[in-house]
Amino acid sequence: MDKEKYSFMNPKGIETFAFIFSGNALQWLHGTTTDDNGRKIGNFTLFGDLLARMALADGTAKGFHRPLTLSVGQAQYSEEQLSTQWSMGRKRIRRLLDELARLELIDTSRSRVASVMTFPCLLQWMTKDGSVVSNPFIHKQRERIEPL
């Protein structure tokens, strides 16, 4: 897949989000990453693309070789797929995901069967129909913070 043909995804079906970011995470989100072709991509665009993969309801993820049951707030991903879509090498994708985990923007769980990420910085979201969903994957130290 040519990145020029890939349209970065935006979360669908969500009216608003409530996040909590560290200062370092905010700095990263406002920065850019250069792909293998020398094009700059806003880091918030990359984060939004990952967030758009998040399950909004419990169910089976489609589009991968092996179906995987996901809970609300989880996203299945493939480093190989991200590498192709974002025009970056797989090692670079791995380092980028590791950096996002260090900044507590995502948590990842990798296995031979599937790779799953969660978004511990996401407190809750409101769907288009007005229902509020609390993120079940908030880090423990964040649970004491009251969302707006």
Residue ranges, per PLM feature:
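A generic structural signal for solvent-exposed, polar alpha-helical segments
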Residues: G23-Q27, T34, S83, R92, ...
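Winged helix-turn-helix DNA-binding recognition segment
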Residues: M54-T118
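Winged-helix/helix-turn-helix nucleic-acid-interaction surface
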Residues: M1-P11, G89-L148
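Short recognition helix of helix-turn-helix/winged-helix DNA-binding domains
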Residues: M1-E79
